[in-house]
A protein has these predicted regions:
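Formylglycine-dependent sulfatase
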Residues: 4-5, 10, 16-302
Length: 302
C-alpha cells in the first residue's frame, strides 16, 4: 500500500483506504498552525513552492471566500470541534500547557458525532485545548482528555511547540515517562536549580524571543517551566515525521471501516525547528523551512 505524503501532510485519495460505503466517506481534517493564506503557492505565494498542499487544492475545492470564528490556537480548535463561537466560553483563549480541558465532556462534539455515525475517530498532533481538571499529574493517566472529547485514539502534544510540557501523550498517558524521573510542570515559577532561557543563554541554540525565557528543552527556550521526564522529552526535529507515522498507522489500522482523523500540524508555529533534511531548503530561513516540511513537495512512503 502506498500512502501519499505532502511534506508532513497525508494524501488520502478516495478509495485508497477502502471506503466501504459511499455514504460514509473517510474524513481527514488537517489544521496547520500559524500558516497564512499567502504562504501557499496555490494562493499566489512565489517564494516557496508548496506543491504538496497545491495538490490538495487542485484535486479538491478551494475556499476563496471563507471566514473563521477565530484565527489563533485554542479558540479556533475549540470552535472547530464544538461548533461554538469561542467567545461563548471565557476559557477559550490561548492556554498554558497545564490548563484544564475547556470542552465540557457532556457537550456534543465533532468527533462524538462522527463516532455516533459509525466512524472510528483519531486525533494526532497539536491539541491545545487543555487536559485534566487543572491539577494534572503528568506521570499518571490524564483524565479528562481527548477520549472524553470523542476520540478513540490520540497521540498529541498538550499545547504548542514552545510551551511545556515537551512530551507526547498517547491515549491519555505520557509517552516514555518513568517513575525514576517524574515530570513536573509549573507556569508560575521555575524549579530550583533548573536552567532557563533567560538565565542561561549559553545553553541555547536560538535566541529567546519575548516570553520564551523558561525551561530549556533540546536547546530551545520554552514558555513555562518543567523538571524531570528527561527520557520523554521530544526532539523538535523529529516531531513532524513522528506525528505522520502515528497518523499513517491510524489510517492503516482502520482501513476497512470509516475513519475520521483530526491531524493538527505543529508547523509553522515557533520555535520552527525543522528536521535536518529540510534545513536551508527553502532559502527563506527557519519559517520557510518548516512550511516546506509541512506543505512542500510530495513524497511517497511505502
Amino acid at each position: 500500500m502506498k500512502i501519499g505524503l505532502i511534506g508532513g501532510l497525508l494524501l488520502v485519495p478516495a478509495g485508497i483506504y477502502g471506503q466501504t460505503k459511499m455514504e460514509s466517506p473517510n474524513v481527514v481534517i488537517i489544521e496547520a498552525d500559524d500558516l497564512g493564506f499567502g504562504d501557499l503557492s496555490c494562493y499566489g505565494a512565489t517564494a516557496i513552492q508548496t506543491s504538496g498542499m497545491d495538490r490538495l487544492a487542485n484535486e479538491g475545492l478551494r475556499f476563496t471566500d471563507a471566514y473563521c470564528t477565530a484565527a489563533t490556537s485554542t479558540p479556533s480548535r475549540y470552535s472547530l470541534l464544538t461548533g461554538m463561537y469561542p467567545w461563548s466560553n471565557p476559557q477559550a483563549k490561548i492556554l498554558p500547557g497545564n490548563a484544564a480541558l475547556i470542552i465540557d465532556t457532556h457537550r456534543i462534539t465533532l468527533p462524538k458525532m462522527m463516532r455516533s455515525a459509525g466512524y472510528v475517530t483519531g486525533a494526532v498532533g497539536k491539541w491545545h485545548l487543555g487536559l485534566g481538571d487543572g491539577a494534572v499529574d503528568w506521570n499518571q493517566p490524564i483524565y479528562p482528555g481527548a477520549k472524553e472529547v470523542g476520540y478513540d485514539y490520540s497521540f498529541i502534544q498538550a499545547a504548542t511547540n514552545d510551551r511545556v510540557p515537551c512530551i507526547f501523550i498517547e491515549n491519555g498517558k505520557g509517552v516514555g515517562l518513568s517513575a525514576d524521573d517524574p515530570l513536573y510542570v509549573n507556569y508560575r515559577m521555575n524549579f530550583p536549580g533548573e536552567p532557563t532561557g533567560k538565565d542561561n543563554p549559553e545553553l541555547l541554540r536560538m535566541h529567546p524571543s519575548v516570553g520564551h525565557g523558561g525551561s530549556i528543552v533540546n536547546g530551545v527556550p520554552r514558555i513555562g517551566f518543567q523538571k524531570g521526564g528527561k527520557a520523554a522529552q521530544w526532539r523538535d526535529e523529529d516531531m513532524a515525521e513522528l506525528f505522520l507515522e502515528k497518523a499513517k498507522h491510524f489510517l492503516q489500522e482502520n482501513q476497512n471501516r470509516p475513519f475520521f482523523l483530526y491531524y493538527g500540524l505543529h508547523q509553522p508555529h515557533v520555535p520552527r525547528v525543522p528536521n535536518e533534511r529540510f534545513i536551508g531548503k527553502s532559502g527563506m530561513g527557519p519559517r520557510g523551512d518548516v512550511i516546506l516540511e509541512g506543505a512542500g513537495p510530495a513524497e511517497s512512503y511505502g
